[in-house]
Amino acid sequence: MNPTYITLFSCAGVGCYGFKMNGFDCIASNELLEPRIEIQRVNHKCKYESGYICGDATLSETHQRIYDEINMWHEKEKLEQVDVVFATPPCQGMSTANYKKNDHEQIRNSLVVQAIKLIKAIHPKVFVFENVRAFMKSICTDVSGEDMVIKDSIYKNLSEDYNIYWKVINFKDYGVPSSRPRTIVIGTSKQLTHISPLHLFPTRQKEILLKDSIGKFARLQYCEKDKTDPFHFARPFPEYMLDWIKDLKEGETAFDNPDETKPCTFDADGNRIINKGAYMGNKYRRLIWDRPGACIATRSDVMSSQDTIHPCDNRVLSIRELMTLMTIPNTFRWTNHDDKLTVENSDEYLKENEGNIRRCIGEAVPTQIGSDIASKIRTMLDFESFITKAELQKDSDMNFYIQAFKLVGEIPIIDSFDKINALPSELSHVSIKLASIADSLAYIPQLCAYYSAADSIDIDIVGLNEEDNNKIESLFKLIKMGSNVSVNFRPSVSVYKHYDVVVENGTCRAIPQRKVNKKSSFENELQLSFFD
């Protein structure tokens, strides 16, 4: 049976499309708005029609429909336990993009609590929250009726049954060609003794510059369409705005112009009123080729939204460019008519669908992030099945954890997670020392995730013989550790070299910084660097 998942507040299903790409079956998908559920239908997200649950997540009948779907899977598909619940509660009350907040923010944030209730009732093997960077510090009304920060509510209700880890990351450092600072929270059931939340976090990757992601698309003049792609077009805008942006260089905003060409409105007498405000800094601004794309907002159709103007062309980014910046594959469909869409018949289609498509892209989890997490969950679930049921999947030869277990036997994953979670986390350059095969295999994947935001992670494996070094090197080829990681095999190290973290005898500890008067020296050094 394929691994399974349920999505809550799933919008158009862009992020969880990554689960579909990795062979997961969707049991149920809950979303409030029917047009977005329809996009999920077009992409054949759920196995059964009854799995598309359009409804208010605060209502008990919506919860019951989800439970009914799970019960149907128990009977029809012989489901034992839901593998994943993936939740992305609406974030308007927490987001900095929507600065006009209101008195209902706290109630809206309490949609998070509906997800917590469902996770507690469903008891999946893994749960994942994705939200804005302020997510864990925002106030919600807990299940108990008490007001508390979301972090406390999650831990209070779920930490008894789950190992939980969270961090704020920028998706541009994890394979997405646009900036998107977000909070990821992952919980793994304590019944799964060989899966840690750190195993499931996205892998650090090199930044992808704007020129390398959308630079391949055709340049477009005012109102021009790409003759080969109906989703790549220059969206029309009032021609008088052309004077505001036509002379802008990369990174400049129309508010850098002389007064006569600054963005404005007109009063009843026809007098120009220059737009002013504290939040104008990223409006009418050109993007920069040699940086990742800016964070994509829901109003990418207008130049007055945040960072929407092409680096060279006088237009906002096209739908195809936005899809690329959010790693949405071309196989993703927005309507049942996409396969018949041509440049010639696209006007009516875009008139009806463009606004919804752009809003869905602006609210989405990038598909790459969903895919990376899903791939890692599948790998770890296969490992857990191998340990508990002696089941080998067809790709087990490529599963790092199965092969590591065959080499060294028991790997103390949960013990190592608890110890790693107690380490200092805010380090820009991390130096780590290990001295055994078992410690290396248990700790290195998790330490790489724990310190994924660091500029560099320098790992020394010390004192092993050549045969053991070769075994570890061979296994590491089966896993992506991150573009900021280098692994070095050393016969010995100088006593003067400082390590931030030392792992030995199945435990790890942080080492305080000390002054060093002599330079470290190494002999017969073999260094292997892994850049993904």
State each model region's role.
Residues D68-L79, Q92-K283:
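Class I S-adenosyl-L-methionine
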Residues E239-V408, K518-F531:
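C-terminal target-recognition/interaction regions appended to catalytic cores
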Residues I27, D83, K125, S428, ...:
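Conserved acidic residues
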Residues T4-Y5, H429-S431:
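Residues that mark the start of a beta-strand
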Residues K151-I154, Q446-L447, N470-G482, D500-V501:
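Short, aromatic/basic amphipathic alpha-helical patches
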